[in-house]
Amino acid sequence: MTCPRNVTPNSYAEPLAAPGGGERYSRSAGMYMQSGSDFNCGVMRGCGLAPSLSKRDEGSSPSLALNTYPSYLSQLDSWGDPKAAYRLEQPVGRPLSSCSYPPSVKEENVCCMYSAEKRAKSGPEAALYSHPLPESCLGEHEVPVPSYYRASPSYSALDKTPHCSGANDFEAPFEQRASLNPRAEHLESPQLGGKVSFPETPKSDSQTPSPNEIKTEQSLAGPKGSPSESEKERAKAADSSPDTSDNEAKEEIKAENTTGNWLTAKSGRKKRCPYTKHQTLELEKEFLFNMYLTRERRLEISKTINLTDRQVKIWFQNRRMKLKKMNRENRIRELTSNFNFT
């Protein structure tokens, strides 16, 4: 059998609900289902459950249990394959209440969540509803979306619909960046100031002359010797100065490291400062009398010529080594002069 095409589902339900249609069904659910089998189509799917079909003047019978419904469901499944059965036209969608969706659909209250391209993809889904929601409903539930929730890196405020965007939304990102720049400049200013300001103590140390320079200025007024004596004094000073200046150089290096040696261009070694003519003459005179000095005599000489005890001691050591070297060279020269190599 086939269903007539001009019959609507409501035409079957109306005679059943009429007061004169009571003879068509009884209280048992099985006999009621047989009345629907005459049409051989899934018309009863649009009707309510069996308990709602009882008479208005009678209360729902407690003997009617849920175990009577499987016979009704089995008959619905046995009516035929949905491909062969008659298919009614898709009814027009019912108007939905404002802001209500089925539980399987996720609500998106924030219109700024996606860009314009991604919002266009959700257009066909909205067409299924006959009465789509107005834009104002979405604008009421709009909340500010953080930057890390946005789907695209571009500013979503530029992609908003006219109902969701405003003049303040476009100015907000630029005002935030402008407010961050003064803070960065404020943080950079103390760093620049810290780089420029340095302690002035190294300059004062470099301006103060060393004690050796003071001694040389005082000793310049001493008597001048012959040119040969000045050459000898220079030679002696060249031998004695490296040894005398080692300890003082180490002490000054430690002092410079504590005062910030990296600011100056000085090297680690102290500048070579030879003895003056007056100092070398006094030391040579004492060396002729005695090659080895006692501690008391060494202190007296150091006070008279403005030298330290250590400097006098090292000068005498170097002078003895020089005399020893000269004696060895003279002895070798005498030995070689006796032999004539042909």
UniProtKB/Swiss-Prot annotation:
One of the protein's GO biological processes: positive regulation of transcription by RNA polymerase II
GO cellular component, one term: nuclear body
Alphabetical keyword list: Developmental protein, DNA-binding, Homeobox, Isopeptide bond, Nucleus, Phosphoprotein, Transcription, Transcription regulation, Ubl conjugation
Pfam families: Homeodomain (PF00046)
Annotated positions of the Phosphoserine modification: S189
Bias (Polar residues) ranges: 1-11, 204-219
Chain positions covered by the region annotation Disordered: 1-29, 187-271
Modified residues (Phosphothreonine): T8
Stated family: Belongs to the Abd-B homeobox family.
Cited function: Sequence-specific transcription factor which is part of a developmental regulatory system that provides cells with specific positional identities on the anterior-posterior axis.
Protein name: Homeobox protein Hox-C10
